[in-house]
């Protein structure tokens, strides 16, 4: 059985993440999804809690044809220990899927197979762009799965982000 690992902050979870996970599901028997920086929320760069991000992922992936686990992972401030920390928080996995150079380097140094999936429309499908659109009152809903729109509305996420940023 092969188990893949994919980590992100998911602030918010968007169509680019969805595309990558759908591709991973075609090759892995199971997927472990790490919600990174789980301890951070209520900032402009990280407005959503780990629990809210777990909800976004779980609802968006209901129809994924691959079993998955969504696991919040808090940051450690020592990169040399990070892989061991991740491994202590997750089921065992064979392959890491990431385009983040640091994540790729750390897992490669630990002897883990690392695959770099093609990014999906990276210029428009990024958490930074989506949060900027929310702050500017621009349409953002088309950049995330419908379940994420529902979660963000349910938690009044746009209003939270605007209050945190000091705008209305």
From Swiss-Prot:
Catalyzed reaction equations: beta-nicotinamide D-ribonucleotide + ATP + H(+) = diphosphate + NAD(+)
Primary localisation category: cytoplasm
The keyword Nucleotidyltransferase is annotated on this UniProt entry: yes
GO molecular function, one term: nicotinamide-nucleotide adenylyltransferase activity
Matching SUPFAM superfamilies: Nucleotidylyl transferase (SSF52374)
Lineage top rank: taxon: Archaea
Pathway: Cofactor biosynthesis; NAD(+) biosynthesis; NAD(+) from nicotinamide D-ribonucleotide: step 1/1
Enzyme class: transferase
InterPro entries associated with the record: Cyt_trans-like, NMN_Atrans_arc, Rossmann-like_a/b/a_fold
Keywords: ATP-binding, Cytoplasm, NAD, Nucleotide-binding, Nucleotidyltransferase, Pyridine nucleotide biosynthesis, Transferase
GO CC terms in record: cytoplasm
GO BP terms in the entry: NAD biosynthetic process
Localization annotation: Cytoplasm
Keyword Magnesium: no
Matching NCBIfam families: arch_NMN_Atrans, cyt_tran_rel, PRK01153.1
PANTHER family linked: BIFUNCTIONAL NMN ADENYLYLTRANSFERASE_NUDIX HYDROLASE, PHOSPHOPANTETHEINE ADENYLYLTRANSFERASE
Family as reported in the entry's similarity comment: Belongs to the archaeal NMN adenylyltransferase family.
Name used for this protein in its record: Nicotinamide-nucleotide adenylyltransferase
Record organism: Methanoculleus marisnigri (strain ATCC 35101 / DSM 1498 / JR1)
């Amino acid at each position: 059985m092969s188990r893949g690992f994919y980590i992100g902050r998911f602030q918010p979870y968007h169509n680019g993440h969805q595309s990558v996970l759908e591709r991973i599901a075609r090759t892995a028997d199971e997927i472990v999804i790490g919600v990174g920086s789980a301890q951070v929320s209520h900032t402009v760069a990280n407005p959503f809690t780990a629990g809210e991000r777990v909800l976004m992922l779980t609802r968006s992936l209901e129809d994924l044809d691959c079993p998955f686990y969504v696991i919040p992972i808090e940051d450690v401030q020592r990169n040399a220990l990070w892989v061991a920390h991740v491994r202590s928080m997750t089921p065992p996995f064979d392959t890491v899927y990431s385009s983040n150079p640091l994540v790729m380097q750390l897992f490669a140094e630990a002897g883990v197979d690392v695959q770099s999936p093609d990014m999906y429309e990276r210029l428009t499908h990024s958490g930074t762009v989506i949060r900027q659109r929310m702050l500017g009152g621009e349409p953002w809903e088309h950049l995330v799965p419908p379940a994420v729109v529902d979660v963000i509305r349910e938690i009044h996420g746009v209003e939270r982000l605007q209050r945190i940023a000091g705008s209305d």
